[in-house]
Amino acid sequence: MGRFREDMETYKRNDPAARSSLEIVLTYPGYHATVLHRAAHWLHTKAKLKLLARMVSGFSRFLTGIEIHPGATIGRRFFIDHGMGIVIGETTIIGDDVKRFHAVTLGGTGKDTGKRHPTIENGVLLSAHSQVIGPVTVGEYAKIGAAAVVLDDIPAHTTAVGLPARVVRVHTPEEIERDTTIGGNL
């Protein structure tokens, strides 16, 4: 239960519209998708009940409009704001304190086996409609701009925008200190 409480506290801290824990538990699709994913991931990786895991994942997608493969690994304090249209592929690895907005895709390359989805390191911000495709890495506390398409690695502590995404800004030491002290990009 500790992880679910931590997830709920993450929503309270990151969404100024959240009025209570009860409101989050009852009405927040991003929270529902996260909690259901944690259950599906356990079924998929620990219990080895892959069909049941896919059924939980399918129910979550039906309920929330957010598609997270049960094989994806998601760290602590994961935050989804306005989650419709989110896709997270099977071999995706997401670190702690990652924030993402609506219609973000962490997609694969079409390879049949092996690592084919992105690695998103701690503290990354994924803006609306951004796409990260293939086995690339987005470094710690990077910010991916709205509608950016990431096809190559993005270094830590940078901002990337465009199609294809290019680094347009390297964060200052003061920004890095602020981001890492308060638990991620705001």
Segments (PLM) and residue ranges:
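Terminal amphipathic alpha-helical/low-complexity segments used for targeting or macromolecular assembly
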Residues: 1-64, 174-186
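Structural signal for interior beta-strand "rungs" in well-ordered beta-sheet cores
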Residues: 61-62, 66-168
